[in-house]
Structures are given as C-alpha cells and as structure tokens.
UniProtKB/Swiss-Prot annotation:
Tissues expressing this chain: Detected in brain.
Primary localisation category: cytoplasm
Quaternary structure, from the entry: Homotetramer, and heterotetramer with other DPYS-like proteins. Interacts with DPYSL2, DPYSL3 and DPYSL4. Interacts with SEPTIN4 isoform 4. Interacts with MAP2 and TUBB3.
Subcellular location: Cytoplasm
Keywords: Cytoplasm, Methylation, Phosphoprotein
GO biological process, alphabetically ordered: axon guidance; negative regulation of dendrite morphogenesis
Lineage of the organism: Eukaryota, Metazoa, Chordata, Craniata, Vertebrata
Known function: Involved in the negative regulation of dendrite outgrowth.
Annotated protein name in UniProt: Dihydropyrimidinase-related protein 5
GO cellular component: cytoplasm; dendrite; glutamatergic synapse; neuronal cell body; protein-containing complex; synapse
Family: Belongs to the metallo-dependent hydrolases superfamily. Hydantoinase/dihydropyrimidinase family.
Amino acid sequence: MLANSASVRILIKGGKVVNDDCTHEADVYIESGIIQQVGRELMIPGGAKVIDATGKLVIPGGIDTSTHFHQTFMNATCVDDFYHGTKAALVGGTTMIIGHVLPDKETSLVEAYEKCRALADPKVCCDYALHVGITWWAPKVKAEMETLVREKGVNSFQMFMTYKDLYMLRDSELYQVFHACRDIGAIPRVHAENGELVAEGAKEALDLGITGPEGIEISHPEELEAEATHRVITIANRTHCPIYLVNVSSISAGDVIAAAKMQGKVVLAETTNAHATLTGLHYYHQDWSHAAAYVTVPPLRLDTNTSTYLMSLLANDTLNIVASDHRPFTTKQKAMGKEDFTKIPHGVSGVQDRMSVVWERGVVGGKMDENRFVAVTSSNAAKILNLYPRKGRIIPGADADVVVWDPEATKTISASTQVQGGDFNLYENMRCHGVPLVTISRGRVVYENGVFMCAEGTGKFCPLRSFPDIVYKKLVQREKTLKVRGVDRTPYLGDVAIVVHPGKKEMGTPLADTPTRPVTRHGGMRDLHESSFSLSGSQIDDHVPKRASARILAPPGGRSSGIW
C-alpha cells in the first residue's frame, strides 16, 4: 500500500466504537490520515473505501510501550529489525511502538539515540518513539538528558537496579537521575530487582552445579523484586518525582505498588503479556531449548496464581499498561548459555500476540471489559507519553490509527505462522478469541483479511512532549503546598564546646571546669612519674588548715604491752 494517506478516504461503517471510558455505535470517517467524523448517518464525500464493521468493535490502535528491535544485548542481536518488528505489531493490531536506546557505560546518550534513529527511520512501518537508557551517571549525562528532552522528542528514561557491573545504578545515582527527570519533566522508568543479591544468588546456584534455565528463576526470587520496588518508590518519593515500574512480575511487587498508590504516591506500572499469562514452570522443562526460550528478567513466576493476579491488577488500575517487552532470540542464540544460565540472552517475543492474548485472558477470562482492554493496551500509554487524545482515542481530530476487532473470531497461535522473528512462540497452540481484521495506520489500510500491505519506512517518529499531565500535574501542585521550609528562630549566643579529636594537638583553651590529665605515652601506657597526684601542693583541699604533725598515743586496736 504505497498511496499517500492524504489521498485515502475510509469509512468504517456499522461498528461499535470503543474508547477507554465508553462504547457506542457509530461510523468513523477518515481522511488525510486523521479521523474526521464519528457518528451515525455521516455526510461524506464520494470515493471512500467502505469497511463493513457490523458486529465488530472499532478500537484505537494498540501502543506497545516496550520493544527492543535491532538491539544487541548480552552479546546477541535481537532477530527482529524495525521493519519486521513493526510489521508484526501491525498484524497484531498495534499501530505504535516505543523502542529502547541502551547506551554502553561511558558513552554518549545523544550519539546512541542518533544511531537508533538512523536504523529505525528507513525501516518502520508504523509510528514510533524512543526511551533512552541511563546506564551511568555524570554531569555529562544530565546535560544530554536535557538535550534529548528539549531537542530530540524524548520524554522517558530507563534505569536498571539489576545487571550488576553492566547497567545497574546505585541508589545515590538513581536519586540524582530522578532529580534530573523531575526538573525537565521526564518519566523515569525503572527495572526493579536487587542486583547485588541477584548476582550473589547466581554465584551460589552455579556453585551448586545448577547451570540450566531454572537458575534464572532460582537467582531472581520475587522478594528481591518486591524489596527493590519498595526502595525505588521511596527514592522517587524523596525527590518528589514520579516513578514508572516496568516488567512487574510478581504478586509481592504488585502489592507494594498497590500500597504506594493507596498512600497517594505517584506510581505508574506496566507488566508484560508473558508475565500476565504464563508461569515459570517452563524453566523446569526437560527440553533445554524449551526452557531457555522462556528466559526473561524478571523471570516468569512459579506461583500459578501470579498471572491471574497480575491480570486483576491490570483490571483495577494498580498496573496501568501491558507491554510485550519484545526481544526475541533464536534457539541458537540462547544456546550461548547452554553451560551457564547467566549467559542465556534475556528476551522473549510477543509484539504480534499481545493484543489477542490480553483479550483472551483479560476480557474472555472475565477480568476486564472492552473499555479497560483499550485502556491497558492503548489509551493509558498515550496519556502517560503525552500523546493523548491524538493517539489512544477514536474522536474527530485524532490520528487515524484504528483497528477493526472481531471479539468472536478465534485463532491458534503458532511459531509456524507468526510474522515476528524467532523460531519459538511462548503461546504455542494457545487458542485466542479476539482477532484484528483490519489495521489502519496513519489513515492507510496496512493489514486486511490476513494480507499485509505496507512498505518499510512509511511510519514516522513521534516526538514526545515533557511534563505529561497524568504524571506531573499532581506533583507540581504538591510541591507548592509541601515545600520544605526552615524554622525562623532566635540565634543561639551561648558557649560552644570545643571538640578535641583523639591523637590531635590541643584545639583551644579548655573551659575551667573541664577535667584534664597528662598525655599518655605511645601505645596508651600512662607514665606514673608524670602523675598528677602529689603529697603537697596543687591539691583540691589545699585551702583547708592543717596541723603540721600529731602524736599517736594509741594505735588502732589499742595499746600493746609486754607479757613479762
């Protein structure tokens, strides 16, 4: 489909328009890449392509907030570049992705960003934006963060509390990054796990002879995620900065987030479709390649209640977004860690299946309605990224990123039919209700009835504005009312004690009532010849009159006498 969106007219007729807050029957007219009209019995010019959506839902295109196309990680390069990755996204009903720029330590953030743009711009099939990773801290990094926000259209930065000696930041560095984010109105995204203890756990597992994929689950227990989640929320709260938790994987971490929100802290959180639908039992599969295919961090959890619990947290807005965290590797690439689980590249696929999997487990599973589905797959992301209502809503004036969704149709997921890269699918043979029939991106039909019709490079970079209201509006007001102020008091004018440090010479004249004694010899031994004790003179009772001498007539015990 090479036609310019300015020349394309589309009428979606007879469907139910679903936004995050309402559902109503309406037709949708699209022209020049923009939704022009929404309603019944629309007056439209001739020549429009008519799409019959009777009995179907018309929803905003999905926004996947975490993808890793053409990224090299743990000595392996993800098998999907920006063309194949965005193609898979569109086939699955996602019309915008957010990629990751992950600079190495001591390297320029701006240069890494420009390299990623050079890879993406000629390849993308849908609109995209970028998060930039903060993997080290220095004044130069802070300056480049400001440049990226003010000149390059970046409004979010990713940090890691794990990946020790690679990407992990210390608490004090996170504190500084959060201050910088708050000042420039950016969103700090954090992968929360206790990296120090994860590293120790990995060493212990290897020492016990555990080398297989189960070592990932063993060395990344959920208590380390919960501890780090609480800690980073505390750090962010101390800096009056919002916090966005990524890859939330456990019940205990979800509970920490829920408690923080109840306390009024500005906390946002996303999980992945893998964590919200699968379990960590796969790590104990007898087939090594099967187990390794599920290796991601944080790992999938053994507790079989976890996935349904996370889906419930998505439904009640404790978790705001479900992303794919798409970073697929082949079995051959995963096999780099066949003798050592710490060398298995972390990453799974999911950009193509995200929407259908969440519909099946969320809506069909009775956890959420179609409006909440739109919220967690599209609208909330648009609001947090400061794109709403241009993206994430079906209204006049919004970008024409629209999906015709069949809630009753079914499909069976398989690696043999997937568009996304990799030779394995986590959801193999999973039967899903909810299928995208038509995907419209930038006002062009790019996928219809199983046929993909889009050339590479037709997507565009979307600059993101800072200070999104949903994130910062409350904090700006709080800072006005909760500003820390010192106490205006009368100065203290009395005496001040002088601190004498051991081993140092006299720092000043001691006060009259300060007890003193001679300096001890080296090694702490007193010199008895230099004792302050004296039989006469310089004694405390010298002023009391004394007799010169006295004769003792009877010693204590009485006088003694001879026996003869």
